Amino acid sequence: NESELERSVRYSDFSLKKFFEYVQTKSWFKNTIFIITADHTLYNSRTNFKTTFHIPCLIYSPENLGAFKSNKTTSHMDLVPTLIDYLHLQTTHSSMGKSIFLDSDGFAVFKFGAEYIILTDQYCLTNDLENPIKLYEIRSDKDLKHDISKKLPDIAEDLNKKLLAYLQIVTYSVAQDKIYTAN
């Protein structure tokens, strides 16, 4: 009588076990950094903020990476800068993300349905570019039911400016082919 989510977790656990049993026999295993993450949650398990936007991410290196836990809000765009930072590489890279090892607040920007969302450790701001923005305090309002943009207009406006600037930079970079230069 397992739920779909429980079956999925059990299968993922089994698959990862089999994968690591196999790769740990390879000579390259101890010098490899593994990133285990998801691209989205199960759609039918989306009942509140956490089940909608929270996905796991595990960075595992058998020989190199000590234990580290971050509760910082991050996104997949932070993976490349995090690895570059961890490996102490001096390189130019094309990424809108930031290393999770930096001593700075994390945030994530994404599109969910018709809404653009900027997420911080404390707030979620939504903007569909047509209606008034909405701001939620995610620690106390996990269902995102209580818009507090009128109570905290400065925070709402600051986050909205950050969101719009981010979207503008991404749009310009893609339109001008500035994301990656081969040489």
Question: What does each model-identified segment do?
Answer:
Residues 1-183:
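Solvent-exposed soluble domains appended to multi-pass membrane proteins
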